[in-house]
Amino acid sequence: MSLKEKLIEKVHTEEHPHAHNKITVVGVGAVGMACAISILMKDLADELALVDVMEDKLKGEMLDLQHGSLFLKTPKIVSGKDYAVTAHSKLVIITAGARQQEGESRLNLVQRNVNIFKFIIPNVVKYSPDCKLLVVSNPVDILTYVAWKISGFPKHRVIGSGCNLDSARFRHLMGERLHINPLSCHGWIVGEHGDSSVPVWSGVNVAGVSLKSLHPEMGADGDKENWKDVHKQVVESAYEVIKLKGYTSWAIGLSVADLAETVMKNLRRVHPVSTMVKGMHGIKDDVFLSVPCVLGYSGITDVVKMTLKPEEEDKLKKSADTLWGIEKELQF
């Protein structure tokens, strides 16, 4: 009789138990691991799977997390190059791909990452045909479209992390100016995650008080307080962080865990995430852009119809045209 048998009396043998709330992170770079630790610390999964092509790094990251098991409430952390480890995932987060270099635009990464997605997506779909896909790799709007095309999933199950982080950055900067917690500062950035994102100045408020009604020049060129600069800082923030530390990780990891929480707990919170916007705001092509979406267990269940000023709508359309110009040239 082994020590284990002497110590423990078996009551019931489970038949092939598999996780009920499994999350997979594809790509264990700085962003993937920031997503992983943020998800672990929010107790969102009963199993976490990590996948990457770099086997040593992958095993090292898995072991490092497993060694912290005592301090976490996710009983199973697995990893592998083979996508079989991802089977039965409820949510699959894709962070793999070529990374933005200093000064490089997100759009420049496109074809490099399309080729990577051609391998990843079919493997994810094979083992978790009912999962929700959350795309984080840049350029996120285009790669969410690519993931949708390759997966064959209905559009409500393919979500791009989109402007969830841009809006969070905006609210942080707004909070700094007003000396108010960002949770109480409301403002939305929509459109492309990146250089052509659109700040919806008309909706910016604190406690339901429209800031533009108090300060009509807000967001305009002639504004003495130069609020436009807040949006400029949002656009430049990733470039600044990349210049200083080489990559971004913590904020996007926290932002992704925020989205994962809404999905896994069926919270039906509204987030600015990338979804198919054809037919909205005069957009006629199969473009993915961020608009306010209700998220829950089945993915994106609803879209909030924003009231946009004509110039905001024009910017959104222009964003869509830019993205479609690139999407229609892609080689699948």
UniProtKB/Swiss-Prot annotation:
Protein name per UniProt: L-lactate dehydrogenase A chain
Record's keyword terms, sorted: Cytoplasm, NAD, Oxidoreductase
Keyword NAD among UniProt keywords: yes
InterPro entries associated with the record: L-lactate/malate_DH, L-lactate_DH, L-lactate_DH_AS, Lactate/malate_DH_C, Lactate/malate_DH_N, Lactate_DH/Glyco_Ohase_4_C, NAD(P)-bd_dom_sf
Protein location: Cytoplasm
PANTHER family: L-2-HYDROXYCARBOXYLATE DEHYDROGENASE (NAD(P)(+)), L-LACTATE DEHYDROGENASE A CHAIN
Positions of NAD(+) binding: 29-57, 99, 138
Coiled-coil portions: none
Organism: Sceloporus undulatus
GO BP field: lactate metabolic process
Designated gene of the protein: LDHA
EC number: 1.1.1.27
Chemical reaction(s) catalysed: (S)-lactate + NAD(+) = pyruvate + NADH + H(+)
Catalytic residues of the enzyme: 193 (proton acceptor)
Subunit structure: Homotetramer.
